């Protein structure tokens, strides 16, 4: 087989090695525009798990690479004048130039033809070979040439970052967070040789502009950034530059990775944010998978390339999603700068769903025990009864006004909620209880006056009252969601505007704002008379009050429509009136949709403003939901998918939150509450 590989980065060189190793008769050529010793950046990092694949794929290069590693186990977090160390994070670093040299030597040893200083302006001269491999990086000529076939999706993360070096070896992988007059500067630092480290510095675009970095030369930028981190570098040490330009991280994802005899891999096909340290790992694993597929299918090139895609794309997509979560986390890190150092380090380590409380405990049990003890002391106001070991965070108590919840677990909405009071959750939230007969979802929806007396013992019950609005007069949901009753069985519907919820549902009348408040106040009074101590107002999921909040459902031209201030007027009037009716010592919650998950819906900024206004009007806890404002919702699913919204609301608005969304284990609850992303979590059953 004749193979032309465009690009002599790690992916291209490693693929050439593996192809030539699998069959010495293969004619493998690597074409590179730069000199063999030219490289940008400083070091690359590998996790412990990624080395197993390299060992199996080519033991000779594995030995050469690992003998050049700088390895470490702990990880340091430097924040607010403290250093927190977390063990069990086994990583290794190597100079990028050294990695490329070792791969070049191995390729040359096997007989790979290496052509440096050759500019590839067109792929045309190389297409006569059996296989053309685009390993030409994020700015791939190969991908651009076949854009119609690869169908790339390109984007850029809003934060700015630059790669620097340092003339010292940090003892371990080190995160540094510095508050400056211009904003927060972050450095992700790792050693790659005896006297050298990589420092990736990350800042917001606002900080980049406020500091004047947007107008500085490369040398001026280097000197400025060194001054920011001089205390961490220490006297006599300095930062180093090598094309250390401020950039936005490029997002690259392609629907297809091959066409005909052309295939792309590594950064040419996909990128993953540097904060999860997987870019080089993904590139090398691409090479392993492609070489393996070619060896298995031999002359059947299409089968080999198809198998390569089928094997690698799901793996890459999962890591890309994790890297997006991680990138967004670092871009919004300032919201956590009120956290104590232990909790700050904990939430840093658990920033993606891949690392949970149990995972972290397996890495560093002592660190997790310290976090558990600290969390319990914060929740209970004192050490947990003098115990040597604190219970897990999910079982810490929570006080809302004068009501104490036994733990952070919730069940909701529970149709037969009375049967779940002793299931172990500290809180049980009822399904929507209608404030009037016209506010029911379906004929089986309970009215406040029909509730039983508040039970004694077991979990606390939060009664969720609301008005279904244009999602009312439906069949019971066991027959299907949002299916209208037969015409004779329907009751009149109201909404913020006369817009049907879905094309097949009835058109409601525009609600009279003057008649919004009293049904909620009366329902709250009835709930209290029955002895319940927790009440929630349901302003979510397209129900009546939610329709006032969302620009997708509210097209009014009076003082209750248009601006966010106007759209809030009705919900805030209800909240204020119910808060005045509900006893001052008892907590009042609000459920609201933090995102409509549909184009043109509530913006992220407006969503946070809504949460702040609810808090100011007397809401003690917010159940942060998403979607269902309109039937065209584009749902987001995945492990703990709703936690990010809860996190944002809790830590930017200063209000306790209830998180939802495929939270299925106590381990996940431990993780979310200990990290400060929620105060209570609804367990999916």
Report the location of each language-model feature:
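Flavin-dependent oxidoreductase catalytic cores
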Residues: 370-685
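Conserved Rossmann-like nucleotide-cofactor binding loop
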Residues: 11, 36, 139
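Conserved N-terminal glycine-rich FAD pyrophosphate-binding loop of Rossmann-like flavoproteins
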Residues: 35-53
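C-terminal helical "tail/cap" subdomain of flavin- and related membrane-associated enzymes
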Residues: 292-383
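Conserved N-terminal helical subregion
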Residues: 48-163, 368-378
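Conserved FAD-binding catalytic core of PHBH/FMO-like flavoproteins
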Residues: 105, 126-249, 253
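Glycine-rich FAD pyrophosphate-binding loop
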Residues: 20-41
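Conserved mid-domain beta->alpha element of the FAD-binding
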Residues: 8-18, 134, 245-325
């Amino acid at each position: 087989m004749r193979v032309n590989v465009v690009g002599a980065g790690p992916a291209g060189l490693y693929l050439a090695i593996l192809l030539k190793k699998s069959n010495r008769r293969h004619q493998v050529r690597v074409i590179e525009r730069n000199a063999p010793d030219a490289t940008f950046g400083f070091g690359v990092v590998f996790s412990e798990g990624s080395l197993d694949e390299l060992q199996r794929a080519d033991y000779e290069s594995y030995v050469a690479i690992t003998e050049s590693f700088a390895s470490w186990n702990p990880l340091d977090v430097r924040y607010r004048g403290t250093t927190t160390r977390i063990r069990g994070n086994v990583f290794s670093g190597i100079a990028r130039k050294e990695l490329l040299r070792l791969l070049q030597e191995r390729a040359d040893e096997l007989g790979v033809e290496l052509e440096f200083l050759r500019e590839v302006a067109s792929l045309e001269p190389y297409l006569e070979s059996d296989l053309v491999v685009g390993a030409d990086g994020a700015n791939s000529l190969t991908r651009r040439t076949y854009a119609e076939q690869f169908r790339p999706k390109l984007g850029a993360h809003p934060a700015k970052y630059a790669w620097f070096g340092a003339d010292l070896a940090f003892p371990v992988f080190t995160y540094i967070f510095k508050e400056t007059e211009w904003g927060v500067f972050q450095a992700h630092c790792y050693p790659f040789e005896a006297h050298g480290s990589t420092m990736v510095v990350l800042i917001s675009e606002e900080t980049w502009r406020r500091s004047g970095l947007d107008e500085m030369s490369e040398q001026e930028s280097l000197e400025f950034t060194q001054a920011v981190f001089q205390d961490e570098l220490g006297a006599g040490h300095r930062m180093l530059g090598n094309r250390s330009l401020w950039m936005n991280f490029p997002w690259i994802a392609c629907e297809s990775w091959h066409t005909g005899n052309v295939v792309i891999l590594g950064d040419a096909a996909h990128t993953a944010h540097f904060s999860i340290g997987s870019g080089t790992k993904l590139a090398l694993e691409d090479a392993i998978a492609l070489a393996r597929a070619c060896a298995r299918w031999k002359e059947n090139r299409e089968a080999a390339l198809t198998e390569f895609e089928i094997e690698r794309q799901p793996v890459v997509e999962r890591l890309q999603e994790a890297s997006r979560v991680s990138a967004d986390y670092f871009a919004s890190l300032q919201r956590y700068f009120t956290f104590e150092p232990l909790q700050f380090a904990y939430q840093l380590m658990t920033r993606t769903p891949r690392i949970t409380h149990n995972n972290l405990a397996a890495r560093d049990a002592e660190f997790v025990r310290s976090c558990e003890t600290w969390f319990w002391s914060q929740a209970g106001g004192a050490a947990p009864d003098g115990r040597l070991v604190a219970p897990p965070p999910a079982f810490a108590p929570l006080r809302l006004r004068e009501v104490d919840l036994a733990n952070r677990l919730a069940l909701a909405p529970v149709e037969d909620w009375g049967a779940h009071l002793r299931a172990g959750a500290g809180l049980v939230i009822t399904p929507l209880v209608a404030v009037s007969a016209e506010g029911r979802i379906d004929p089986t929806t309970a009215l406040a006056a029909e509730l039983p007396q508040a039970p004694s013992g077991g979990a606390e019950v939060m009664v969720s009252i609301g008005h279904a609005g244009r999602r009312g007069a439906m069949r019971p949901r066991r027959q299907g969601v949002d299916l209208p009753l037969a015409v004779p069985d329907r009751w009149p519907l109201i909404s913020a505007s006369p817009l049907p919820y879905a094309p097949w549902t009835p058109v409601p009348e525009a609600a009279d704002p003057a008649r919004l408040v009293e049904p909620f106040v009366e329902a709250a009074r009835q709930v209290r008379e029955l002895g319940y101590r927790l009440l929630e107002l349901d302003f979510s999921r397209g129900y009546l009050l939610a329709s006032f909040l969302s620009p997708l459902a509210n097209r009014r031209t009076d003082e209750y429509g248009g601006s966010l201030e106007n759209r809030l007027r009705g919900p805030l009037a209800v909240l204020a009136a119910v808060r005045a009716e509900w006893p001052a010592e008892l907590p009042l919650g609000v459920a609201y949709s933090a995102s409509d998950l549909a184009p043109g819906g509530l913006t992220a900024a407006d969503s946070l403003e809504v949460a702040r206004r609810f808090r100011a009007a007397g809401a003690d806890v917010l159940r942060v939901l998403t979607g269902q404002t309109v039937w065209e919702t584009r749902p987001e699913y995945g492990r703990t998918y709703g936690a990010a919204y809860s996190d944002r609301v809790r830590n930017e608005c200063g209000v306790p939150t209830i998180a939802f969304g495929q939270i299925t284990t106590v381990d996940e609850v431990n993780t979310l509450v200990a990290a400060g992303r929620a105060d209570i979590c609804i367990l999916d059953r």
